[in-house]
Amino acid sequence: MRLSTVLLGSLLGALTQAAPTGQFPGHYQSSPPPLGPSNWERNPVSVFFKVLNTQPDPDYTMLKELVTYDCTYVSLTFDNPTLHSIMPWAGTHTNIGPQAFIDIFTRVGLYWDRGPFTIDYIFGDGGNVTAWGSFTATSRTLGKTVISPWAARARVNEDNRIFYFQWMEDTFTTASSFGSDASNKTYVSNPQGGTTVA
């Protein structure tokens, strides 16, 4: 059994068996939502989990509850003007609070059509929490689809609110979804010699 299964199982509690198909209109099987407002324990890992899962449809009310007003969000890099020119949300958003999450999550959705997003592992040590997984995204400008690993970490205060958030991904891959076929670049990385065109 994977660590994430064990952690999420203890985080969410026991899931009830799906109701018989005849109990619902249309005969669709259903089960209670795993993180409803009345059945989740607020702790650093569960807060982090909820924030990660609001990316496709940012919930400002929830983010105001789970993120401090002066939270700092580091997106992809501390400061990289070239990357920022491709993905304008890249960089350090110091003391912007929940609005940084809304701005970044919304803008990502404007630039990419989001595909599957997985949280493979999530765990914490007190107020320090981390998670990683993968996501698929298709650029809305060129229709290029990429798959990237991601990793995130957060620091959570004693009130179980995030005051520092950092998101990393394979920016070489994700930025390439916006590159035209003619936009090759030559790299000289090997000290033994040679170049790579990508």
UniProtKB/Swiss-Prot annotation:
<dbReference type="GO" id="GO:0140723">
    <property type="term" value="P:patulin biosynthetic process"/>
</dbReference>
<dbReference type="GO" id="GO:0005829">
    <property type="term" value="C:cytosol"/>
</dbReference>
<comment type="similarity">
    <text>Belongs to the patF family.</text>
</comment>
<feature type="glycosylation site" description="N-linked (GlcNAc...) asparagine">
    <location>
        <position position="128"/>
    </location>
</feature>
<keyword id="KW-0325">Glycoprotein</keyword>
<dbReference type="InterPro" id="IPR032710">
    <property type="entry name" value="NTF2-like_dom_sf"/>
</dbReference>
<comment type="pathway">
    <text>Mycotoxin biosynthesis; patulin biosynthesis.</text>
</comment>
<keyword id="KW-0732">Signal</keyword>
<keyword id="KW-0560">Oxidoreductase</keyword>
<dbReference type="GO" id="GO:0016491">
    <property type="term" value="F:oxidoreductase activity"/>
</dbReference>
<comment type="function">
    <text>Part of the gene cluster that mediates the biosynthesis of patulin, an acetate-derived tetraketide mycotoxin produced by several fungal species that shows antimicrobial properties against several bacteria. PatF catalyzes the conversion of phyllostine into neopatulin. The pathway begins with the synthesis of 6-methylsalicylic acid by the polyketide synthase (PKS) patK via condensation of acetate and malonate units. The 6-methylsalicylic acid decarboxylase patG then catalyzes the decarboxylation of 6-methylsalicylic acid to yield m-cresol (also known as 3-methylphenol).</text>
</comment>
<protein>
    <recommendedName>
        <fullName>Patulin synthesis protein F</fullName>
        <ecNumber>1.-.-.-</ecNumber>
    </recommendedName>
</protein>
<keyword id="KW-0963">Cytoplasm</keyword>
<feature type="glycosylation site" description="N-linked (GlcNAc...) asparagine">
    <location>
        <position position="184"/>
    </location>
</feature>
<feature type="signal peptide">
    <location>
        <begin position="1"/>
        <end position="18"/>
    </location>
</feature>
